[in-house]
């Protein structure tokens, strides 16, 4: 597949990108190069190759789920100018 100047201008218009004639000509070559590389990739035999998300093997670090109340309410409301029974008190702004 090759991209011509009209296709580049049409895609730029659809993407709402202002492209000058010189830029469109340059992009035509660049897009054709990219598409050529993609065509090369489609020729690679990947039968039997498992999909991967990274080139390095990675394992997710897992932790045990421990239910806790946090016990930080007093520390949190200590920063508030006004509080009552671990609730923030704020001035009334809406009638």
From Swiss-Prot:
Subunit composition and interactions: Heterotrimer of A, B and C subunits.
Molecular-function GO terms, alphabetical: asparaginyl-tRNA synthase (glutamine-hydrolyzing) activity; ATP binding; glutaminyl-tRNA synthase (glutamine-hydrolyzing) activity
Reaction(s) catalysed (UniProt annotation): L-glutamyl-tRNA(Gln) + L-glutamine + ATP + H2O = L-glutaminyl-tRNA(Gln) + L-glutamate + ADP + phosphate + H(+); L-aspartyl-tRNA(Asn) + L-glutamine + ATP + H2O = L-asparaginyl-tRNA(Asn) + L-glutamate + ADP + phosphate + 2 H(+)
Name recorded for this polypeptide: Glutamyl-tRNA(Gln) amidotransferase subunit C
EC number assigned by the record: 6.3.5.-
Biological process per Gene Ontology, one example term: translation
Keyword list, A-Z: ATP-binding, Ligase, Nucleotide-binding, Protein biosynthesis
Species per Swiss-Prot/TrEMBL record: Rhizobium meliloti (strain 1021)
Keyword Protein biosynthesis: yes
Pfam families the record matches: GatC (PF02686)
Keyword Isomerase (UniProt): no
Similarity annotation: Belongs to the GatC family.
UniProt cross-references to InterPro entries, sorted A to Z: Asp/Glu-ADT_sf_sub_c (IPR036113), GatC (IPR003837)
Gene: gatC
Function field: Allows the formation of correctly charged Asn-tRNA(Asn) or Gln-tRNA(Gln) through the transamidation of misacylated Asp-tRNA(Asn) or Glu-tRNA(Gln) in organisms which lack either or both of asparaginyl-tRNA or glutaminyl-tRNA synthetases. The reaction takes place in the presence of glutamine and ATP through an activated phospho-Asp-tRNA(Asn) or phospho-Glu-tRNA(Gln).
Broad enzyme group: ligase
